[in-house]
Amino acid sequence: MKQLLEFIPLILFFVVYKLAGIREAAIALIIATIFQMLILKLKYGKIEKQQIIMGIAVVFFGTLTAYFNKVEYLQWKVTIVYALFALILLISQYGFKKPLIEKLLGKEIQLPEKIWNKLNLAWAGFFILCMLINIYISQYCSEEVWVDFKSFGIIAMTFIATLFTGIYVYRYLPKDDQNK
C-alpha cells in the first residue's frame, strides 16, 4: 500500500501531461504530492526524510514549472534530488564513516562492513548515473521523451538496481536469513 501510494503522483503527472500539458501536469503533481504526504502522516504517523525532501522539491520546482510554464524546472528537480541523494550517501561514508545504507537497513539485515560500504557506493553511483542520464535526456531529447523517461525509465532503472542489490546481498546474509 505504501509503495503504491508513492507512485500515484507520478502516474497522475504522466496522465495529465499526456492530456493537457506540462503546466497542468505540474499542478496535478503538486496537489497529488501534498495529498500523498497527508495520507502518509495520517496512516503511518510519520513521513520519511527522503519523502519530505522529494515533497519539498516537487512543490518548489512544480510551482516554478506551473507558473512559468517551463518544464526545465521539473527537469532540474530530478537532477538536484539525485545529486543530493548521491552526496548524502558519499558524505555518510567518507565524512561520518558510517554508510547511510547500513543505518537505514542494518536493523533488518546483517552484513559485513565492507558490503555495506560497497552498497552505499553502488547506490551513490546509481544516483549519479540517474542524474547524468536525466541531464542528457532533458537537454538533447524532446519534452515528451523526458516525461516518459521520468515516469517510467527511472522506475525501471530503480527496479533493476534494487534487484541487483538483492542478488548481491543474498550471498552475504547469514544462512538462517537466506531462508526467510
Curated annotation (Swiss-Prot):
InterPro entries listed in its UniProt record: YciB
Membrane topology listed for this record: Multi-pass membrane protein
TM spans (from-to): 11-31, 52-72, 76-96, 121-141, 149-169
Localization, UniProt: Cell inner membrane
Any single Gene Ontology cellular-component annotation: plasma membrane
Highest taxon of the lineage: Bacteria
Keyword Membrane: yes
Keywords: Cell inner membrane, Cell membrane, Membrane, Transmembrane, Transmembrane helix
Positions of disulphide bridges: none
Keyword Transmembrane: yes
Pfam families xref list: IspA (PF04279)
Similarity field: Belongs to the YciB family.
Family annotation (PANTHER family): INNER MEMBRANE-SPANNING PROTEIN YCIB, INTRACELLULAR SEPTATION PROTEIN A-RELATED
Function: Plays a role in cell envelope biogenesis, maintenance of cell envelope integrity and membrane homeostasis.
Identification of the protein by name: Inner membrane-spanning protein YciB
Species annotation: Mannheimia succiniciproducens (strain KCTC 0769BP / MBEL55E)
